[in-house]
Amino acid sequence: MIVDTFTNRGSTFFSKLSTVLFFLCAVITFQGVIQRREVELDTPVYVHYAKYRSARFYHAFRNVRQQYAQVKFNMDADLSELWDWNTKHVVVYLVASYSTEKHEKNQVVVWDKILSSPEESKMFMKDTLSNIQAHPFNEYSNQFEGKNATYTLHWTVSPKMGFLSWGAGPGSYEIPFHKIITQPK
């Protein structure tokens, strides 16, 4: 019986290789947890207005008229501090926070963008409208009237190896929702 066959040597080699790679991944993940840095970015978002109207979207799960809001904003942000050697991509999103009678805190994503490289992390956006098709911002009580929302820029850093990290910039001042009155044709 031959003990040192090609199959046995290959099995031993790949067993040791997978063990080394496993411990290397564990060390990198542990290092990411230890060296996790809290990044404080001053990235204000200036919201011009938040408007709403009644509409019926047939692709929605309920075929009823609902109030949908749309937000127009400016943003000048430099998120390059979020990048290091282990960053795969950064997801940036604008969150509207408001309260209702039933719920103390409601948070809705009204805009998002995936940054795949550090060059994309310098963002200058002027008069940008939230996409009502990608992020339908509706209130199930159908009462945007009299409500104010605070808008905050959030980010999630996805590492190549390790755990997600996230953060948020300063919130804007409260912006009231304005109703759009459509003229009959």
From Swiss-Prot:
The chain crosses the membrane at residues 13-34. Keywords: Endoplasmic reticulum, Glycoprotein, Membrane, Signal-anchor, Transmembrane, Transmembrane helix. It comes from the Eukaryota. GO terms for biological process: protein targeting to ER; signal peptide processing. InterPro entries: SPC3. It is found in: Endoplasmic reticulum membrane. Its main location: endoplasmic reticulum. Signal peptide: none annotated. Belongs to the SPCS3 family. This is Signal peptidase complex subunit 3. The lineage of its organism: Eukaryota, Fungi, Dikarya, Ascomycota, Taphrinomycotina. The gene is spc3.
